[in-house]
């Protein structure tokens, strides 16, 4: 019995499908290798960051001991970063502080943002002081905020940072591939801090456990909650996170 000949179009279609399947298989192998390499990079960076944080902490402890042994005082480095929380609503806000709150992206009560501390931003914070609480966040505070409340601004949408791929797609061109890269850039106020910080949507916090103080709108040093509370911002954020 004579074999059935396939029409030329079917032969071409079969070859094209086979070629497409081979290309997809090859692309999958490349993608898997790339993802494996990327995971290794992310893992190695996270380990390097942890060593960097630990070494810096030990260096400060040693410097304090050396200063004490020499009969002098250790002076902390000037803070480069603050975390700012809006604690007062929209009623009776003068135009200038209202504008500052808009510049800081603090458009809602209990919203929080990171701010690079400079002479200019220090002046802005003073103008908005009756409406905000701020201070110097530690690594633990930054990490808990980003992991628990972190959202990115993607096409004007608020998107949860549920996957490193989201971060890489938006910040990869700055070398920020993972959530630990993002935390490191914020904590160290790195060269791409502006891009990393602008990517972060303002944090939406809750009212603190037990509420604010009864003299909430007095300055912190007067028994209230507004203004610069330095390292004590970490306790407030923990209550609100």
Curated annotation (Swiss-Prot):
Domain of life, source organism: Eukaryota
InterPro entries xrefs: Ribo_uL30_ferredoxin-like_sf (IPR036919), Ribosomal_uL30 (IPR039699), Ribosomal_uL30_euk (IPR005998), Ribosomal_uL30_euk_arc (IPR035808), Ribosomal_uL30_ferredoxin-like (IPR016082), Ribosomal_uL30_N_euk (IPR012988)
GO CC annotation terms, alphabetical: cytosolic large ribosomal subunit
Database matches in SUPFAM superfamilies: Ribosomal protein L30p/L7e
Gene3D superfamilies in the record: Ribosomal protein L30, ferredoxin-like fold domain
Record-linked CDD domains: Ribosomal_L7_archeal_euk
Keywords for the protein's UniProt record, in alphabetical order: Ribonucleoprotein, Ribosomal protein
MF GO annotations: RNA binding; structural constituent of ribosome
GO aspect biological process, one term: maturation of LSU-rRNA from tricistronic rRNA transcript (SSU-rRNA, 5.8S rRNA, LSU-rRNA)
Renumbered residue ranges of the record's region Disordered: 1-25
Keyword Transmembrane helix: no
Family recorded in the similarity comment: Belongs to the universal ribosomal protein uL30 family.
The name this protein goes by in its record: Large ribosomal subunit protein uL30
Organism: Debaryomyces hansenii (strain ATCC 36239 / CBS 767 / BCRC 21394 / JCM 1990 / NBRC 0083 / IGC 2968)
């Amino acid at each position: 019995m004579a074999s059935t000949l396939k029409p030329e179009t079917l032969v071409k279609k079969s070859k094209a499908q086979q070629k497409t399947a081979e290309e997809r298989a090859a692309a999958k192998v490349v993608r898997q290798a790339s993802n494996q390499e990327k995971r290794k990079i992310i893992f190695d960076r996270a380990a390097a960051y942890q060593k960097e944080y630990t070494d810096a902490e030990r260096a400060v402890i040693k410097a304090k001991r050396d200063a004490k042994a020499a009969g002098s005082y250790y002076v902390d480095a000037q803070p480069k970063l603050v975390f700012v929380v809006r604690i007062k609503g929209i009623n009776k806000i003068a135009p200038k502080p209202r504008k500052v709150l808009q510049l800081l992206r603090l458009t809602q009560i209990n919203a929080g943002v990171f701010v690079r501390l400079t002479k200019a931003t220090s002046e802005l914070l003073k103008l908005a002081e009756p409406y905000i609480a701020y201070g110097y966040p530690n690594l633990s505070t930054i990490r808990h905020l980003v992991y628990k409340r972190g959202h990115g601004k993607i096409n004007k949408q608020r998107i949860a940072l549920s996957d490193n791929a989201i971060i890489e797609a938006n910040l990869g061109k700055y070398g920020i591939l993972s959530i630990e890269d993002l935390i490191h850039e914020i904590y160290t106020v790195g060269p791409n801090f502006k891009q990393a910080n602008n990517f972060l949507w303002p944090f939406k916090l809750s009212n603190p456990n037990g509420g604010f103080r009864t003299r909430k709108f007095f300055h912190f040093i007067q028994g209230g909650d507004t203004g610069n509370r330095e390292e004590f911002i970490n306790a407030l954020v923990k209550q609100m996170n």
